[in-house]
Amino acid sequence: LPGNTSVSAGGAAAGDIAQGLSAEGLCAGYGDAKVLSDLSLQVAPGEMVAVLGRNGAGKTTALMAIAGLVPTDSGTVRVGGADLTRASPGARVGAGLVSVPDDRGLFPSLSVAEHFSLVGSSVDEAAETFPALAGLAGRRVGACSGGEQQQVAVGLGMVRRPKVLMVDELSMGLAPQVAAELLAGLRALADAGETAVVVVEQFVDAVLAVADRGLVLSE
């Protein structure tokens, strides 16, 4: 079963862990297949942490367990000091724990602007971080490139002003330059000091250049 090891990176000073994310001793899996064993992760507001590891190490399962999308056998999840261990995925979102899945969770037939309307926001707000979105408001998401779709997905998470934002497989299928722009946007969100950012990323050098530290999951 995967273990975890922390590695240091660059990054800014963070706030109080109690106001961010605290996951302790999580064990999770799918049926009889146990994928995570005793996973712990603490991320303070203002901090950006990269979750790293080989395919099959449990990175996606870790984020899904924290988000309440896979059952856990043991452990606790707290956000902003509130115990969310038994909370539903929707209740966790309401408490400020927002997750961007690896499939981005978008609706191909809806426009970019319609997506932001669904969360009570606008493209203009997200375009402050990702300027390219300003020209995509009327375009159907299904007609957007992979990089544009990922900017929409991450932007939707950011405009909710969450206490914790988790992004799975940030750069999957994207050019390094596009991935770097997304990482810079997440770094800026963390630097604003109100959000703890967790990102699963395959470009290790790129993410450790902007993250405060990395958590390496091993099989």
PLM region spans:
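Conserved ABC transporter NBD signature motif
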Residues: 75-82, 95, 123-128
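H-loop (His-switch) and adjacent beta-strand-loop-beta switch element
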Residues: 214-219
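Helix-to-loop junction immediately C-terminal to a conserved catalytic motif
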Residues: 67
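Helical segment within the ABC ATPase nucleotide-binding domain
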Residues: 180-192
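ABC ATPase NBD coupling module
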Residues: 83-104, 137-138
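ABC ATPase C-loop
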Residues: 157-158
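The feature captures the beta-strand-to-loop junction immediately N-terminal to the Walker
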Residues: 52-54
